[in-house]
Amino acid sequence: MEKNVIFFKNIKFYNCSFRQILYKIKFGGYLVAPAASSLSKICSNKQYYNSLKNSTVAIFDSGFFCILLFLFKGVKVKKFSGYLFLKKLINTELKNKKILSIDPSRKESFLNKKYYRKKKIKSYSYIAPFYKKNFYDVKLFKLIKQINVDYITINIAGEKQEILAYEINKKFKKRKLKIICTGA
């Protein structure tokens, strides 16, 4: 599978199937699906760039980025949206699993809980504060410590969710959490 890894600015993008990507995070780590607009800011946002470089898997969520890779580097990759990844994950992997959904608002949290309930997935939710620079969220870390979840989905804004995933992964490395950042 390593032949399906494309490095861009030391970020490991995987041009693989859903199953192969899922296997990469099976033993813990975090998946990111950066937008082209966010990738354009990696030189000015070091914290964001560091979180992408340290991700377990980055997927080609941006069709524009895929086109640019082909035009400028001659590298042909297949777009794999974060939405599609999350949809497949929910429909195939999350039955009888527990999930923590980190949401930007009460409304989003309510809608996600309702959706997970319909899919018969045990879910917990956390409404994230508005993070500025410090992503070390003690309240969130206490919740993660209390509940034993299989997956964490982070549904806050891009350039923030990836940094939060990095902090969670660093704090709970031994728990082997599977963290999914697919967009707000």
State where each predicted segment sits.
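Conserved beta-alpha
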Residues: 66-143, 147
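Structural motif
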Residues: 31-33, 59, 100, 151-155, ...
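Proline-aspartate-enriched helix->loop->beta-strand connector
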Residues: 144, 148-158
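Short Gly/Thr/Asp-enriched flexible loops that form oxyanion-binding sites at enzyme active sites
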Residues: 113, 161-172
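Short, conserved loop/helix-junction motifs that constitute active-site signature segments
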Residues: 50-53, 94, 170-175
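N-terminal nucleotide/polyanion-binding subdomain common to many enzyme families
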Residues: 1-78, 83
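Short glycine-rich anion-binding loops that position phosphate/pyrophosphate groups of nucleotides
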Residues: 36-39, 156-160
